Amino acid sequence: MRPPRRSAPILVCAISMATALSNATVHRDAGTVESTPPPDDEDNYTAKYYDDSIYFNIYDGTNPTPRRRTLPEIISKFSTSEMSRLGGLKAFVPVDYTPTTTLEDIEDLLNYAICDDNSCGCLIETEARIMFGDIIICVPLSAESRGVRNLKSRIMPMGLSQILSSGLGLHFSLLYGAFGSNYNSLAYMERLKPLTAMTAIAFCPMTSKLELRQNYRLEKARCELIVNIELLKIQNHGGQTIKTLTSFAIVRKDSDGQDWETCTRFASVSIEDILRSKPAANGTCCPPRDVHHDRPTLQSSNSWTRTEYFEPWQDVVDAYVPINDNHCPNDSYVVFQTLQGHEWCSRLNKNDTKNYLSSVLAFKNALYETEELMETIGMRLASQILSLVGQRGTSIRNIDPAIVSALWHSLPEKLTTTNIKYDIASPTHMSPALCTIFIQTGTSKQRFRNAGLLMVNNIFTVQARYSKQNMFEKKIYGYEHLGQALCEDGEILFQNAGQKFCRPFTDNRTIVYTMQDQVQRPWSVTWMDFNLVISDYGRAVIENLTESAMSAHKNGPRYLQMETFISDLFRYECHRDNRYVLEKKLQMFYPTTHMNELLFYPSDPTLPSPYGNGHY
C-alpha cells in the first residue's frame, strides 16, 4: 500500500522543468546513461533521461488502447500547464516493463535523475538516480518504492537509528574501555554511515517528541517499560547539530515502590560461561589446531589496556583462538587474535582475562544488542514523524526490556564523554568539503519509589574542516558513502591527530593512514531550505524563497537546478553563514525532576498513582 499522496510536494520543480528538454542529448549503452554538459544558459537546461529507443504506453481514463510515445515526445508535446493536467491519465507504462510507472515517477525522474560523463550505473528504466557530487544513489521505482519521496521515508529512519545506536554504542564502549582508550573508539563507526546520517538530519524536523510504553511480567511483578525520546535540531555558525535525549524508565506497576528492581532481574551470562563458549565469543571461526601460525605472539602480565607492545584499540581483537603449543605455553592461558595478526596470551584465571572478555568479546555481543535496541527506537521515532507506522515495509520490533535492564545495572550514576571526532569527505559539484562529525554522549541514572530512570544524552554535530591538500585530484566514482572519499583502499572508520583508520573492502583489517595537516578557512554556503522544497507550500513559496535572503546569493541554487541544490544540501551540513549563530553554547540537557516523576505515572488509569491523588 503506497503512502498517502501529499499535495504537490516534490513535483513542483519537475513541472517547471518539463519545457527544458531540448538542450541535452542522451544515449543508452550497456545500462549506462551519459549527458552532454549543460549549455551556457543553465536556466533552460535539463538532461534527457530516456532516449528514443524506450517507449511508454499512455493510458487515459476512457480509452483502453494506449498511445506509444517516448519520454521526450511526451514532454515536448505538453506545455507546463498541460503537464499539470496529466494527473488524469492512468499511468506512464514502459512497454516492456511490467510494474506501472506513474506520472509521479516520471516527475521524480525529471527532477532528480542527474548523470555525468562517468555514467550513472543505474538501470535506466527502473531506477532514478541522485547525485551527491561524485556519489550516485539509485532509487528503485517499484510498486512500493516511488522515487525520491521514498528515499526520504527510507533513509530518514535509517539515519536517525544510526545516530541513536552509534551514540549509545560509543558511550557503552567508552565506559568499558572496549579498545583501551577513554577517548577514541572504533566500534560504533562500523554502524555509522555518514551519508545516511547527514541526509536524515536534513529530513528531520526541528523538534520531535515520542513516548512508547510496553508492559511485561517478570516473576510475579507487573512491569512497564517507558521510553521517552526528545529530539532537537540546532543550526549554528559551525554547522548543524541534533541533540537527542532518550529516557528509559522501568516501572513496577503493582506496588508502591516496593522491590521495583524485580522488574530488572533477567537472566545474565557469566564471564566464565563466555570464556568456555566459543559461540559466545562472537561466533568467530577459529583456526584449526594443527595450523602453524607465522605471527608474533605477545605475552603480558599487565592489564590489556596497558600492554607495552601495542595499543589494542589500534588493533581490534576479533577472535578467540583455541589453546595449543604453537600459541601459548599451556592450557592455563587463553589466546586472543587481533585484526592485524597479533596473538595475545593471558592466564585463564587472571582478572585481566575476564576484563578483556567482558570489554571486548562479550562487549561485541552486548553492543550489538544495544544498537538493535537503539535502532528500534530510532526507527520508531522516524516512523512516527513520517506517519509510516502500520504500512507495509515498515519493520518495528519490540524493545527488549532485558537490554534496558542491563543498561540500568551497567551504566554509572553519571558519565559524560569528551567529543569524539570523525572526519568525512563531502564532495560537491562546486568544490570538495572536509567535514568533521563530533559526537558527545552522557548518561544520568536516578531511582524513584516505584521505578528506575536511565537517561542517555547524545549530541551529534557536523562542522566544516578543510585540508591544504586536494583530496579529489584523483577522482574515484561509486563510493558507498561519503567516508570512503578519504580512503582509497576502503571506508574510513575513524580519524584523529593526523591518523586515519580505514577498513578495506575485501577484509576486516584496520589500516592506518597519515593525513596532511588541516586548516579551516571561511566559506560562504548558499542554501535553499530542503524542508520547504518538499513541503505542501507549492511553487509560489519556492519562487519567493529564490528571492529571499536565505537564497539570494549570486551562486544560489535555482529551482530548475536541483543537482546543484542537492550538492548544497551537504555543503550546508558542514557550514552555516554567521547570521545563524547559536545564542548559547551546546549544553547537556535533562528534564526536571518533576518531569521525571511524571514519566512514571502508570498508563493503566485503574492503578493508583504513586504520587498521591494522581493530579499533576
UniProtKB/Swiss-Prot annotation:
Its main location: virion. Glycosylated by host. Residues 1-24 form the signal peptide. It comes from the Viruses. The keyword Signal applies. The keyword Cell membrane does not apply. GO terms for cellular component: host cell endoplasmic reticulum lumen; viral envelope. GO terms for biological process: entry receptor-mediated virion attachment to host cell; symbiont entry into host cell. Glycans are attached at residues 23, 44, 282, 330, 351. Keywords: Glycoprotein, Host endoplasmic reticulum, Host-virus interaction, Late protein, Signal, Viral attachment to host cell, Viral attachment to host entry receptor, Viral envelope protein, Virion, Virus entry into host cell. It is found in: Virion; Host endoplasmic reticulum lumen. Plays a role in virus entry by participating in host receptor binding at the cell surface. Interacts with isoform gQ2. The heterodimer gQ1-gQ2 associates with the glycoprotein complex gH-gL to form a tetrameric complex. The gH/gL/gQ1/gQ2 complex binds to host TNFRSF4. This is Glycoprotein Q1. It comes from Human herpesvirus 6B (strain Z29).
